[in-house]
Amino acid sequence: MAVAIKGNTVNANPTPGKNFYQFTHNQNTGAGGLLIIQLTMSNARSYTGCNYGGVSMTQLYTINRGGLSQRMAFYYLVDPPTGNNTLRINFNNSVWNPISIHSRSFTGSDGIGNDGKVGGQSTPNTQSLTVSQDSLIMATACSINAISTIQIPQGSNRTFATHNTNRQVGTGAISSNSGHNAGSISVRTTSTFGSVTNDRVEILGTSSADTTGGDFFMIM
């Protein structure tokens, strides 16, 4: 196996004001392409789908976090079209509150592996995820209070984007470039106080990663 190659990202915290929001994402060129998007918004509205370059993305999960009045979701697309394309998020009605968006490209990936989702627990919220050799983990967290850290694995603070959706969101945290050994990996999320969620997704590597093809840049 080989670890997936991290590519381009977009972070946004807009207020759509309509029943969709769209932006341009530049998918990196290379074998084993993968595009993911992490979303959080008020649970007054629902996601009705995402598409990239006109191709429908697969919904991994959508969760109504009633205690936080938020709806969190994860969509992905294997072998997406490369280059600059429109990523569109559709809603069941106009959205008048800010939403949290994080999209990321990969190459050299066999797609999505295991995932785990745990609602608000007293900080720190520590959970495990069983992964394959050379996988990466992405994590997101939501709280009434500020997100302090997202640790992948526990003890290793990872950078993340901070968004305000009328709740506090930490999104886009990802493992270091070296990936993980196969087994159970501990992921910790913390907030300044109170409760915090812990959602995590495995990004598979590949046994035939193309580490030389196309345009990409590394996001540490």
Please give the residue ranges for each predicted region.
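Primarily extracytoplasmic/secreted proteins
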Residues: M1-M220
